[in-house]
């Protein structure tokens, strides 16, 4: 009874490509309209003033201005809201 599988058969060797998620524009940065602010899965960050949300939950600037973050309490979860200050 073999206890090794033999040459050329392994169950390892798979990995997915990174999705490059995260904050792309930090607080205090100046951005133009259409700039991507955050790439995310789900809504860890919520859109605030002058910020739109895409179908994949990406947050983007609707107007030119400066990025600002604020903490909010929503349904016992601490979330952050992203605003663009003009």
Swiss-Prot record:
What InterPro entries does the entry give? Ribosomal_bL27, Ribosomal_bL27_CS
Which pairs are disulfide-linked? none
**Xref: Pfam families:** Ribosomal_L27
Q: What segment(s) does the record annotate as region Disordered?
A: 1-24
Q: Name one GO biological process term.
A: translation
Indicate the segments annotated as coiled coil, or none if absent: none
MF terms from GO for this chain are: structural constituent of ribosome
Could you list this entry's UniProt keywords, alphabetically sorted. Ribonucleoprotein, Ribosomal protein
Q: Which GO terms describe its cellular component?
A: cytosolic large ribosomal subunit
Indicate the family of this protein.
Answer: Belongs to the bacterial ribosomal protein bL27 family.
Q: What is this protein called?
A: Large ribosomal subunit protein bL27
What taxonomic ancestry is recorded? Bacteria, Bacillati, Cyanobacteriota, Cyanophyceae, Synechococcales
Gene name, Swiss-Prot/TrEMBL:
rpmA
